[in-house]
Regions:
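A detector of single, family-specific signature residues
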Residues: 1-400
């Protein structure tokens, strides 16, 4: 019975090996994440000729090389949630923290939780690829929001009010009418330099070219706004056209990347057996289906629906003391924030498209009728949605 505690950091780790009752097999020592050092570590563990369990704390991506190598060598490896390890570490009165101390604490955790520890299970290449794509999608969405904010700021100076007339990027059809329009008509002075009839004709030609609705009424509204508005920066300012067109170009490049990633996610997700089941659930469309699967991963790794709900961090923790029993508890938020976000988008989509036959929709409506806020009702609906998701997908895999 030997516990190997590994405190992982970027590019290197500190290893401590213990037996029960604090018997030290090997004092803490450092290794780098290279084939040579990891090979020497695995050879050392094989020579111990005893049952070995390796424990490490989840550290984003830094622990993955060590985890992958040791699992390929056949070792039992448990990856512990950082919050659990923090709680265990806080049991000590002394608050000293070094890599050597941390590795010893992790090794002690392995001894104390020897029979409760679970071996880390990989989710499969498809789920891992979807997860990576989902992470990159969120990254580029942040860039999209930043780029959109910069363009909006410039438009407030050159074309105030235009953002209320033209829609921005649509995640479903991946078209951005506002950016397309500003790329062609980058300042109100460009519009007012023409007569209303000339601008209307130009707008109709532009709309047909970009495959938008060629509405004369819309053109007249835009022209009237251009005449009435007061741009802060005149078009004669030498840098204005360059700044506006560059802001549009950057935004479009980010949006194109988002479109490529989402297309790849849809392509991969459609190869999974559960895709059709997830796609048929209320509120889930072609965009949200791959996102949900990417965030949840292989649902078979959860022991029941409650575990999936806890993974999302929307489980209200019980609280009671003496005669008091807490009823109106808030969600824990100790889980995947990205899954909560995608799940909330799903509930919004479900509520917008009334589906009285859907059990989750009826549940959300019921909670709202009981006096719950719309947000609380949607979170309650998400709780029910994830339980149904778990039941349907696991049932599917049982029958395969």
């Amino acid at each position: 019975m030997i516990s190997v505690g590994i405190d992982v950091s970027k590019g290197k780790s500190t290893v401590c090996i213990l037996k029960p009752y604090g018997e030290i097999v090997s004092k803490p020592f450092n290794i780098t994440h290279t084939q040579k050092d990891l090979s020497e570590l695995s050879s050392m563990l094989f020579r111990l000729n005893d049952e070995v369990k390796i424990v490490m704390e989840a550290t984003g991506i830094y622990h993955l090389p060590v985890l992958t190598y040791l699992q390929e060598k056949g070792f039992f490896v448990s990856v512990v949630n950082p919050y659990l390890m923090k709680s265990y570490r806080n049991e000590s009165l002394r608050k000293a923290k070094t890599d050597k101390i941390d590795s010893r604490i992790i090794a002690n955790y392995g001894i104390d939780h020897w029979f409760k520890m679970k071996e880390f299970q990989t989710s499969g290449e498809i789920y891992e690829e979807l997860k990576l794509l989902g992470q990159q999608y969120r990254h580029y969405m942040k860039l999209h929001l930043l780029s959109l904010a910069e363009l909006t700021h410039l438009l407030d100076l050159t074309m105030p009010g235009i953002k209320n007339l033209l829609a921005s990027w649509n995640e479903t059809n991946r078209k951005d009418k506002r950016s397309d329009f500003v790329e062609r008509f980058w300042h109100y002075d460009v519009i007012t330099s023409m007569s209303e009839q000339e601008f209307t004709e130009e707008y109709i030609l532009w709309a047909k070219e970009k495959k938008y609705v060629p509405s004369q009424e819309k053109a007249k509204v835009i022209y009237a706004l251009a005449q009435e508005s007061i741009p802060t920066l005149p078009s004669e300012t030498s840098s204005i056209k360059m700044l506006v067109t560059e802001a549009v170009r950057v935004l479009k490049e980010v949006d194109a990347t988002l479109g490529l990633i989402l297309s790849r996610m849809q392509e991969i997700a459609k190869t999974l057996p559960e895709y059709s089941v997830v796609r048929e659930m209320g509120g889930v469309g072609n965009t949200l289906a791959p996102k949900l699967i990417a965030e949840i991963g292989d649902v078979r790794r959860f022991r029941n629906g409650k575990a999936l709900v806890a993974f999302a961090g929307i489980d209200p923790p019980p609280y009671e003391s003496g005669q008091f029993v807490g009823c109106n508890r808030k969600i824990s938020k100790r889980g995947s924030a990205s899954l909560r976000k995608v799940g909330y988008e799903t509930m919004r989509s479900l509520k917008m498209r009334s589906r009285p036959e859907d059990p989750v929709y009826r549940y959300v409506v019921k909670k709202e009728s009981e006096g719950k806020s719309k947000k609380s009702a949607k979170i309650a609906g998400l709780n029910k949605f994830l339980r149904i998701y778990y039941a349907r997908v696991t049932e599917l895999y049982k029958n395969i």
